[in-house]
């Protein structure tokens, strides 16, 4: 059964469709958004090798002209060079505003293709077909598109909402276990930030989600998307509540910057340890009970994710370098550090004016070099 979740943004509203084997019906889903019957499918070489023929056949059956634009897999494609390459190839295809860009891949492809669509001829429509758990529950929904720079992650980008998101759970069958765990970090985030009941359901059913049991996986993805859609509809431009979706990300982005945004530390793995750190930092500041922080830590660890600096690739980390990366974070304002912290399980909030020295002391206590 396909679940349809609305992202209520007025004239830019769209649906996220969650279900099995949606790829085989992609032509029917995309056709209403095509004026000329042409789409450039931005994908990475691995995803295209695994699933490209299936998508291409479904689109061609519906009379859609398909132009694959393939990029190397991995975070390195989400760069100025990667963006220039994709936009140049879109120009070479002579796409116009009646055509469509289709992002077919994980978070890297979605961010890159979405940003290219946002700036191509001042904006062209695009559709997301996310192929990782992380992209299905998080990055494909909400219109954030960006590339990385040597100074930090996602620092250059735009808000550009897709016209449709197709989350086909069947493509997750080919997802490596490590990538599945990384995506689960974003699933558990929704419980930790605003739905204690969902967190407790994940404590009991997380193993089933990771094992890709259809009923559990469908519920986990659909509930995650529901929460993301509700928050985005309320606060599209991250002026308020949407910032809560960054739970764990201030720590995570600093760790990713230190490890070079590569395969050594996946984004979801960084978010996993980042959320555990955020809860323990909240407990250290007497904002939440220590038992809640430990419970959050245990639930993240149960998924096979790192929860301590000593377990994180790149260890040992330098506390001053991590704090310096945090000062570059988009959530930092006028030199003040902003964190998403917690008052308890399912109760996150935005904390501004966090003292850098308090963060540094906490990181040292967690095992970073002073």
Curated annotation (Swiss-Prot):
Protein biosynthesis found in the keyword field: no
Catalytic activity from the UniProt record: 7-phospho-2-dehydro-3-deoxy-D-arabino-heptonate = 3-dehydroquinate + phosphate
Cellular location(s): Cytoplasm
GO CC list: cytoplasm
Family: Belongs to the sugar phosphate cyclases superfamily. Dehydroquinate synthase family.
Protein name: 3-dehydroquinate synthase
Names of the cofactor(s): Co(2+); Zn(2+); NAD(+)
Function of the molecule: Catalyzes the conversion of 3-deoxy-D-arabino-heptulosonate 7-phosphate (DAHP) to dehydroquinate (DHQ).
Main location: cytoplasm
Keywords, sorted A to Z: Amino-acid biosynthesis, Aromatic amino acid biosynthesis, Cobalt, Cytoplasm, Lyase, Metal-binding, NAD, Nucleotide-binding, Zinc
Species for this entry: Phenylobacterium zucineum (strain HLK1)
Matches recorded under SUPFAM superfamilies: Dehydroquinate synthase-like
Pathway noted in the entry: Metabolic intermediate biosynthesis; chorismate biosynthesis; chorismate from D-erythrose 4-phosphate and phosphoenolpyruvate: step 2/7
UniProt-listed CDD domains: DHQS
Binding site for Zn(2+): 186, 249, 267
EC nos: 4.2.3.4
Cofactor, how bound (note): Binds 1 divalent metal cation per subunit. Can use either Co(2+) or Zn(2+).
Biological-process GO terms, alphabetical: amino acid biosynthetic process; aromatic amino acid family biosynthetic process; chorismate biosynthetic process
Entry keyword annotation includes Magnesium: no
